[in-house]
């Protein structure tokens, strides 16, 4: 596999070069390669002969998690990243669903699985039992599953998305070829490894001999500590959710002076607000900003566009860009008919980035994946349209609501609320205590203003909204907060916000 070959090349040529760095840890390419060889050998000794069962890797962004990932795939087994924030009950469901035989505990914490179905070891124990003489014939390759990431399932049980070596290689090659991320760059890693956004920085960094700079959850929760670490990081490539960079932008000190070597910002995981992109262009004049889009089921991202001043000026909602060159993206109606440019429907993604399906879930796989025009395709469940080759994503189809007979998109309303001069960021929540939606609530982090009372601020925002939205789409209730809650993955936590504002 090209990715593993590239890591081996850097380990041989520059064994002392840093592959991983955080405030507390460092790992060279030589150490990464040697330790992962030993872990791979140890995995083979601790599992049944010929077994290809997945390996769970439990921890929080430690270097030995990446050692364990590589060790797993060198031993011919896919890995399943499990962050320490994931509840024990969910971990048990993942073990039962995946058939995993081995859990590598990197964090040092005890993992209460309540199950004798899985053996728990540390990477140090595996490395001590293993050796560095492992045949590359064992490596995961081509259609073999490289990693499995578990996402939320509508049944209440997590679904394991299988990403093959070919899926990952196609994605990594695209990032390294079509984005300005040349050899030896320092990449930010903000996303926990159980969130597939982390794949956007881990593997392009390793394939180009770069350094992965990890910022852990405890640093993110302390802005002063976070900014001190960022200042020392020498970051070139920033990858994160828009929500995370928006949180950083709330501090006026988040500028090119803090990150003088920042060259590119890459976003994925949720919609990039135009105001956030504009602020980045203002504060980081030497950096380029890219918006990308893609579900976990299509290997992180399958579209991209560089966000320029012209694109911001011409679009109320930013495009997610053009399809990855080897992918086909089109829009379908509910009857499976392809729609022409400009017509809104479901975004369908086809090509070599599409997952083979959900592990052990043939019925769910059959509903979400299908063959079309000789390619494997995926129903995203996202609404959107294509205009002049560019894809515009308009949120989840299931984010559509009906209010007093009117069908509307919550994310469309959020775009307009966020455009108010008085709003820093906002989330719109439907109030539906007994089934039907009764009205909308806007949870807002306001900009600095001169109003003495909240009702005066609300009136000013509503007046602005009235110029762009029909009355029935304007939220009835406005709640003001000092920040918007985020999930452990760095996305807006809509469920938690809803629970708070609906109390």
From Swiss-Prot:
Any Pfam family matching the protein: AMP-binding
Catalytic activity annotation: holo-[D-alanyl-carrier protein] + D-alanine + ATP = D-alanyl-[D-alanyl-carrier protein] + AMP + diphosphate
Pathway per the UniProt entry: Cell wall biogenesis; lipoteichoic acid biosynthesis
GO CC terms, sorted: cytoplasm
Binding sites annotated in the UniProt record for ATP: 151-152, 291-296, 382, 491
Organism ancestry: Bacteria, Bacillati, Bacillota, Bacilli, Bacillales
InterPro entries listed in its UniProt record: AA_adenyl_dom, AMP-bd_C, AMP-bd_C_sf, AMP-binding_CS, AMP-dep_synth/lig_dom, ANL_N_sf, DltA, DltA-like
GO MF terms, alphabetically ordered: ATP binding; D-alanine [D-alanyl carrier protein] ligase activity
Annotated organism of origin: Bacillus velezensis (strain DSM 23117 / BGSC 10A6 / LMG 26770 / FZB42)
GO biological process, one term: lipoteichoic acid biosynthetic process
Key words, A-Z: ATP-binding, Cytoplasm, Ligase, Nucleotide-binding
Protein name, entry field: D-alanine--D-alanyl carrier protein ligase
Function according to Swiss-Prot or TrEMBL: Catalyzes the first step in the D-alanylation of lipoteichoic acid (LTA), the activation of D-alanine and its transfer onto the D-alanyl carrier protein (Dcp) DltC. In an ATP-dependent two-step reaction, forms a high energy D-alanyl-AMP intermediate, followed by transfer of the D-alanyl residue as a thiol ester to the phosphopantheinyl prosthetic group of the Dcp. D-alanylation of LTA plays an important role in modulating the properties of the cell wall in Gram-positive bacteria, influencing the net charge of the cell wall.
Cellular localisation: Cytoplasm
EC number: 6.2.1.54
SUPFAM superfamilies in the record: Acetyl-CoA synthetase-like
Family, similarity comment: Belongs to the ATP-dependent AMP-binding enzyme family. DltA subfamily.
PANTHER family named in the record: ENZYME, PUTATIVE (JCVI)-RELATED, PTHR45398
Record: residues binding D-alanine: 196, 300, 491
